From Swiss-Prot:
Disruption phenotype: Mice display enhanced inflammatory symptoms and lethality following alum-induced peritonitis and LPS-induced endotoxic shock; defects are caused by an increased NLRP3 inflammasome activation. The keyword Transmembrane applies. It comes from Mus musculus. It is a multi-pass membrane protein. Keywords: Acyltransferase, Endoplasmic reticulum, Golgi apparatus, Lipoprotein, Membrane, Palmitate, Transferase, Transmembrane, Transmembrane helix. The chain crosses the membrane at residues 10-30, 44-64, 141-161, 179-199. This is Palmitoyltransferase ZDHHC12. It is found in: Golgi apparatus membrane; Endoplasmic reticulum membrane. The gene is Zdhhc12. Residues 1-9, 65-140, 200-267 are cytoplasmic. The active site is at C127 (s-palmitoyl cysteine intermediate). Residues 97-147 form the DHHC domain.
Amino acid sequence: MALWPPLNSGMLVRTGHTVLTWGITLVLFLHDTELRQWEEQGELLLPLTFLLLVLSSLLLYLAVSLMDPGYVTTQPQPQGEPKEEQAAMVPQAVPLRRCRHCLVLQPLRARHCRDCRRCVRRYDHHCPWMENCVGERNHPLFVAYLALQLVVLLWGLCLAWSGLQFFQPWGLWLRSTGLLFTTFLLLSFFALVVALLLASHLYLVARNTTTWEFISSHRIAYLRQRTSNPFDRGPTRNLAHFFCGWPSGPWETLSAEEEEEGSSQVV
């Protein structure tokens, strides 16, 4: 019998993120940065604003990592024949597939995540830093988190730079500024990664596609026979639908509408 309960990987990742976030913030306050100078001069507006942004980014991170990303639930089959409007919403050209892992009927754009062991609607990817999937329900919050986190990282980068002192003997510099310089390098790396992630996700959202669809379109049944994205309604409408709330309608319906528009243009 185990003396300790098994460690939850999600709890470890979230605890590590929280400790790292407040640890970096503490370093910026303890060293001779603009943040500390503002505090000593009694100018508390900017330090409090920075702390509020850090706290907001942390709460948003926890919200995205803990919320349901859009798991596909088992729904009972309706009694008798389906209603006419329900049948029209799922055309025969786009049959629903049963997941061979969890045995649920997968809506269009859903995928089974082996890490979460669940099917996720409009699956984008499984984020190891969140220890959660990014899907239909939490993808907008995920992009908002990336934007806010980038602001915090860039501001923290400027604050760390303001406290670096280069004109000192090597030994003295290492003792007084070594930890701050390490923090500066960490912030630089994280800012670059988050900026690239934010840019790529905004690009994909503007095209109404997901990371999984973008990378694996040649293997996805509803995309490999097409020359264009059946869900793309133009950048403005795609962004509006994404940030103003899901769902914008069953994806099967949008796919069918795209086919009808294409056939009418040919005629």
